[in-house]
A protein has these predicted regions:
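Class I S-adenosylmethionine
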Residues: 2-88, 102
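Class I S-adenosyl-L-methionine
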Residues: 11, 18-21, 180-217
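Ordered hydrophobic segments in well-structured contexts
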Residues: 36, 173, 212-214
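Surface-exposed beta-strand edges and their flanking turn/coil or helix-capping segments
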Residues: 40-42, 49-54, 108, 134, ...
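Short, well-ordered turn and helix-capping elements at secondary-structure junctions
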Residues: 41-43, 123, 199
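Short, surface-exposed alpha-helical recognition segments that flank or form part
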Residues: 48, 152, 179
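The AdoMet/dcAdoMet-binding core of the Class I SAM-like
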Residues: 54-167, 173, 183-187, 208-210
Length: 217
């Protein structure tokens, strides 16, 4: 049966999947926004998220020299990875996500398998701890670790931030994606203040409803 509501709104649901990490993930195809993933009431990958990262990474491009090594913590469906690959075609790109389900959906619907990235299904905290112990360094680290609307507190901990800093090259940048509406605003301001204790410089950038916290080692 034709869903006239979806027909007239210009969007359709391609698939719904239950993830043990993110809960229900809905894959939506929209005439206006293309294909995107919705988790709860937020777009997780594709659609407006793609535009947010495109704006952000073009800003970052003017702040960092050509990166040899990029680490994305919270790969999701791969929006950030696709844009990074286009902006820096010769970089070594690593994407980490704990949710295998959303990674597989990214390959199926958003072209993640065409990005030429090392994809690691792992806990971001443990991964960063491991690479920092190995003294592995990245010129650009992107931290996008929301589960729905929640940013797990472990990724605000001293231990995590210390390991991220260790994994960052001397002239590198780390970008934290944070929500910035309602009750999220004071949480993000508090986190911004904490970052200033770990990094020599912390700037903020507003692409739409989010705020990006851009840190220099």
């Amino acid at each position: 049966m034709i869903n006239f509501k979806n027909l007239f709104s210009g969007q359709s649901v391609l698939e719904e999947v239950d993830s043990p990490i993110n809960g229900k993930i809905t894959v939506v195809k929209s005439l206006a926004l293309g294909t995107y993933f919705q988790v709860g009431k937020l777009t997780q990958s594709g659609g407006v998220v793609f535009d947010i990262w495109k704006t952000t990474l073009n800003k970052v491009r003017s702040m960092v020299t050509e990166p040899n090594n990029i680490l994305i913590l919270g790969l999701g469906g791969g929006s950030c990875a696709k844009i990074s690959r286009k902006l820096w075609p010769y970089t070594h790109l690593t994407g980490v996500d704990f949710d295998k389900t959303i990674v597989e959906l990214g390959k199926k619907y958003l072209g993640l398998d065409e990005v030429n990235a090392d994809i690691v299904v792992s806990d971001a905290y443990e991964y960063v701890k491991s690479v920092s112990n190995e003294k592995k360094e990245y010129n650009l680290i992107i931290v996008d670790l929301y589960v729905g609307q929640e940013f797990p507190v472990i990724f605000e901990s001293d231990g995590f931030l210390e390991n991220v800093k260790k994994a960052l090259s001397q002239n590198g940048l780390v970008v934290f994606n944070r929500l910035y509406f309602g009750e999220k605003r004071p949480q993000t301001v508090k986190f911004f203040n904490k970052l200033q204790k770990f990094f020599s410089k912390v700037e903020y950038f507003y692409p739409e409803a989010n705020v990006m916290l851009i840190c220099t080692k």
